[in-house]
Structures are given as C-alpha cells and as structure tokens.
Amino acid sequence: AQFYQGSQLSFGKNRVQYNDFYWTFYRFKNYDVYNYVGGKELATYVAEQAQNEMDAMERTLDYRSSSRFQIVVFNKLSDLKQTNIGLELDDQTYNIGGMTKVIGNKVLIYFDGNHQHLQEQIRAGMARALLEQLFYGGNIRERLQASILLNLPQWYTQGLVTYLSKGWTSEDDNKLRDYIMTEKKPVLNKLIERDEIFAGQSLWHYIITTYGEASLSNLVYMTRINRSLESGFVFVLGVRLKQLSAD
C-alpha cells in the first residue's frame, strides 16, 4: 500500500469540532484508509482486515467492487461523533455494536477497545459498501437514478448486512424462539414490526439454510436486474415473498 501524507482534510463544516484532525491515508487498489494522529497502528489493522473481508464478501455476493471508496478510521467513539460526515445521523445512531455507517462512498469505523466489535464493523462496512454499489451504482448520479427504480426495505438490506457480518448465533436462535413462543401466529410481518433488522437477518438465515448458499447471490442479482423485490424471490426461490413469510 502507498502512504500519503495528509493535510487538514474537510468532510463538512456544520458540526462543532473540539479537535482538529490532521488526516493521512493509505491507498489500496479499491479503497483508501484514512487515519489521524495516534491511529496509524489501528488504520494498518483495519486496512489489512478490510481487504480480507472484501475478498470474502465479493465471493459471497459473486460481485466485484466497481468503484473506489474511503474507510475513515476514528480512534474512539467521541471523535466519530464530532465528524461532519452524515450530519443527519444523531448520537443515538452511534451506539456500541450498532450498524456500521456508510455514507456515500465513505465507511466510518471507530474503535471501542473491543476487537470483535471492530471486526464486525469492518465486515459490515465491506458488505454495505458492496451492496450499495451492486444495487445503486458507484457514483451519485447512478445512485439517485437507481434509488427511484429500486427502493428496498430495511429488513432486506440491513438484515442482509447483519447476516453477512455476524452470521447466525445461538443467541439469535434463542431470540427467534422467544418470539415464536410468545406470538399466537408468528409471521414475518409481525416480527418486522417488532424488530425489522432482526426479522431480515432471520429471513436470510432461513433462505440460505433452506435453499443453499448460492441462493443469496442469485437473489441479490435477480432483484437488481428486475428492479423488483418480488421478482427476485419468484425467479430464484420459486415462491412469492408472502408465501415465504408465512413459512
């Protein structure tokens, strides 16, 4: 990787900042990794892991990255909260273990002292970055045009990112079992109302367990090509979403 000496890079001008960040970055084939004072070792780790995770995600999704993106690494959560990237996000969105933030072509990652959390953020960041490229294109014009034609629900996109970054654990099994036990008629729509992202994660787990790993990339591909959520399920799985939800 090439190392570039940075300057006072600006990502926006509307949020109060208590520290000035002097950014430098490492350049890789498909992305740049930004860091500031005290974050060189962390950025090096993130850069190495990001390449591994990107390779794995590209294989899983059967898709190769079509454009460059930036990974912005923060030494701690309080520094991330000062960033001007994505001002529409409030402090509640930066919860520990929450969804990695991907804004445009930027992936925001912070270190909370837990390397497992960091790894999940990197994995989720690579998944989200690739999925956004796959569904909506690499530049702003493509994304605006595609978003008009294809508006995917949170349970589909964020549920998939969660499944790709965390998989399915015994805790998830217990959580789903509790839901089934407490609902008289447990169906996906009710679970979506209760916990949309977990509902999506559960559905993706069911799809891959029932129809095989290749169904994931095939379903994503057909959804993109047909610009239709329903068509993707019918073409790949042979069932409508309503029927799948009932199962």
Task: Give the ranges of each region predicted by the language model.
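Generic low-polarity alpha-helical segments
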Residues: A1-Q2, G238
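Juxtacatalytic substrate-recognition/specificity segment
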Residues: Q2-S147, P153, S170-E171, L188-N189
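Acidic/His/Gly-enriched intrinsically disordered linker/tail segments
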Residues: D90-D247
